[in-house]
Amino acid sequence: MSNLKQLRTRIKSVKSTQKITKAMQLVSASKMAKIKSQIANSNFYIEAVSKMMSAILSIDMYELSIEEQKFFNTVPNKANLLIVMTSQRGLCGTFNYSIIKQVKNDIKELENKGEQIKLIIIGKKGYEALKRQYVNYIDSYFELPKIHDENLMLQVKQKIMSAVENLEVSNCVIYFNKFKNAMTQIMTRQQILPVAKYQDDSMIDNPIVNLVGFGYKERGVKPINNRRATSDIVGESKSIDYNYEYEGESLISNLINLYVNSQINYALLQSRASEEGARMTAMENATNNANDLISKLVLKLNRSRQAIITTELIEIIAGSEVV
């Protein structure tokens, strides 16, 4: 009988755990849907800013101020700034493992080359995994808030801008998981600075803004003084009027700020969506495993009960035969 009691207790415990994992699965599914909506709404803005920054590469560097040129050129013999985005909580499968593994491999490679390293870590899990081995490299650590917070973006951006302006780093790379679907997250290593040529990953078809319209001249092209910029939308060439609030010099500076902010925002949204997708999948698997375990325990319970009943019947029959 004690065996039956243990089985019933275990079944009750597994059912309780199953309710928790199911609830977590539903919560993660809801959060993932909201973040996917945020990503869709911000894609146009992020891609447009990236393309404008890429277009600056076609401008003669003497058109830019010395401060602005720092964001487009590599500074030799300075630290490599690595921004690592992980989760604040666990129970999300291999979400953090793939990021941490790649960061450790890259750090080892940089150490072998004798290069300097600085780490900005976002998320408790990444900090816990890296602090013991690379505590001397950690420049900053930020906890990931429960909801998407612009203050976090601004703090990280200020760290990056300050490091570049003070010539403390030669480049800046961000590590995050890119969301593909609930079951698939792609470990991504993306260079933020120096600004690289924009690579279209066919997210959406958006206008490509030509900075010639801002009064800057392309290499080998005479300056254009009009106040119109061109845009290519699905193969069509259209002219778009813009209202400018900044002069040419301050425009680039503000665009650099927008660019860095948009890249951090993009990585944070992708990382959050990937985290919730990974957690939803992990909790779904846990719920299914709990269901399978309950079925096995119930079967074992029924067999044990049947064995006890059979034994009692045999004893009764044996007793009646003696009488």
Curated annotation (Swiss-Prot):
Compartment(s) of residence: Cell inner membrane
UniProt key word Cell inner membrane: yes
Membrane topology: Peripheral membrane protein
Predominant place of localization: membrane
Keyword list, A-Z: ATP synthesis, Cell inner membrane, Cell membrane, CF(1), Hydrogen ion transport, Ion transport, Membrane, Transport
Chain residue ranges for the region called Insert: 206-240
GO biological process, one term: proton motive force-driven plasma membrane ATP synthesis
UniProt entry tagged with the keyword Cell membrane: yes
GO cellular component labels: plasma membrane; proton-transporting ATP synthase complex
Cited function: Produces ATP from ADP in the presence of a proton gradient across the membrane. The gamma chain is believed to be important in regulating ATPase activity and the flow of protons through the CF(0) complex.
Assembly with partners or alone: F-type ATPases have 2 components, CF(1) - the catalytic core - and CF(0) - the membrane proton channel. CF(1) has five subunits: alpha(3), beta(3), gamma(1), delta(1), epsilon(1). CF(0) has three main subunits: a, b and c.
Protein's UniProt name: ATP synthase gamma chain
Source organism of the structure: Rickettsia conorii (strain ATCC VR-613 / Malish 7)
